[in-house]
Amino acid sequence: MTAEIIVKNPVACALAADSAMTMTGGNSGTVKIFNNAEKIYQLSKHYPVGLMVYNNADFCGTPWELSIRSFRKLHGHEEHSTIRDYLNSFLSFLNSTYNITSIAKREAKLKEIFRRYLKLNYDDLSQKTLHVALPESDEEALNIIHQRLANFYASENEFLERNPFFEGFDESDVINAREFVINNYLQIALDIFPNNGDLPEHLKTQLINFFTFIICKENVTSLYSGLVFAGFGSDEYYASIITIQIYGSFNNKVMYKIIHGKCSKSDPDNSVIIPFASEDEVFTFVRGFNNSIINFMGNTVSKLSNEILENLRERGVNDEISEQKLISLKDDIIDRVQRYCDENFTQKVTNMLTSLSKKDLSYMAESLVNLSAFKLKISDSYETVGGPIDVAIISKTDGFVWIKRKLYFDKNLNNN
């Protein structure tokens, strides 16, 4: 977990990030938290554009720091019209730099995704159903286990098939992905699933389809890196923000999707606060509540509605109109609460945000990261947010400016 945020108004955008990095140690589950991670980068020394990283700290085993600073050295002098063009340039760089991230490392990343998915799915099914009411015969039990796995992946495939392709992927990539999966997945499956030397064809078919979709289509694996591109292209007079999630690389293409809910176009009327990773405290500040409160309220109203309906039925009242009214009432309650919070919290914060100076923008961004860190400090959870906070301001006039920046060395000893 981490706490990162962008605060944007017509003048500039402020980026703030903590330094915490959480590592879990293999089978032991030991959790180590380090407070020295770099998450904000200057993408060009000549133009007003920055990049922020969250979740995984590497691209197919290559640290983002190496990839980003190599891009800046080779392409930082190139100016682009929009932030989207900077994003495309960076992705092209990732696709072409096999001397930094080799084909072997890219394929190893895909195999890691396969292995984690298989292990997670099998462990989950094992706890729920695999060892319930199995026959005594080993062969019969194995057949039932394989059938249940095949049914599970068939259901997952129905869902994944409806998902959109990763950006830049299409049906032609499915053919190549299927061939790659056939050549690489089988041994991984044999290492994880119980078997007698092979897997039945119907299970193989579902696994092939599953991993083909994982390579080509948007999915919910947590093995991604979030990249946030922020700043100004040469044709943009107001800050633009584009957030993507990168899952790996296949067939000379980066597997990524755009997170539209965490993007902001270049617009003078578009002042926003966008949190990443640890979001609850920011939402509470902006909206007056976080999502868990609304979910709890919705569940509570639904439960009370069901109890009222049950009481009516027990008294011999079976009125479909009453049931529809209760459902409508629940939606109306949620809508009124959200409208109240929007009018009394969100709009006030947004209106205030529009008039903030660069200095106040940076202070606000830093304070919101501090708020998340403090909440974890006084809770019984791991302090997965913390350490020094880096803060940068990007404006059209002044470019990328560091407000606060941690250094791993003594600046007085390194004047060169």
Set out the residue ranges of the language-model regions.
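N-terminal nucleophile
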Residues: 1-416
